[in-house]
Amino acid sequence: MVENGSRVVMEARDIRSALERLAREIVEQPVDPNGLALVGIHTGGVFLAKRLETLISKKLKHSIPVGTLDITLYRDDWTRLHTQPVVRATNLPFPMDDRDVVLVDDVLYTGRTIRAALDALIDYGRPKRVQVAALVDRGHRELPICGQFIGIELKTRSDEQVNVLLKEKDGVDRVVIEQAAQARKA
């Protein structure tokens, strides 16, 4: 569906279905469910990690820990984005050592966000394994990073922006592709 020059590629039901599949894939992997933890990257990844935890906990019949990770000061571009970085809280209420961690983000793009998240995560301990879950993989990698759990792969152009709208912050669940200049004005 096209609205105001933007293309809607996922609606609420599509996002729900993708998250249910991701939860199933995470649970089906060979891992000790007691050593599994989800870490959401601020901001969209935090909401998605919490949703995944709800789905995974139902499947495992017990809760798994969820943390939040701020990567602002680990980014290689923060000085280009803001003169004063906005730093959010990192909350990892579990030991990181020997843990199977799934880093959760809304969009996997160049790989730079995941690289920054790995740097930040390692400052908190030595996980046994780190995997990546993203609702959208839009390609265009600049670093050798890949996602293990992907909701949807989209073919995009570099002049487009993928916006993941989530009901927790935007009041609606939707994934939209827009022209980059259009997205900046919004």
Curated annotation (Swiss-Prot):
EC numbers, comma separated: 2.4.2.9
Keyword vocabulary terms for this entry: Glycosyltransferase, Transcription, Transcription regulation, Transferase
Keyword Transcription appears in the UniProt entry: yes
CDD domains xref list: PRTases_typeI
UniProt motif PRPP-binding: location: 101-113
GO biological process: regulation of DNA-templated transcription
Reactions the enzyme catalyzes: UMP + diphosphate = 5-phospho-alpha-D-ribose 1-diphosphate + uracil
KW Repressor (keyword) present: no
PANTHER family membership: BIFUNCTIONAL PROTEIN PYRR (PTHR11608:SF0)
NCBIfam families: PRK05205.1-1, PRK05205.1-5
HAMAP family cross-referenced by the UniProt entry: PyrR (MF_01219)
Family the UniProt entry places it in: Belongs to the purine/pyrimidine phosphoribosyltransferase family. PyrR subfamily.
Entry protein name: Bifunctional protein PyrR
Organism: Syntrophobacter fumaroxidans (strain DSM 10017 / MPOB)
Gene this chain is encoded by: pyrR
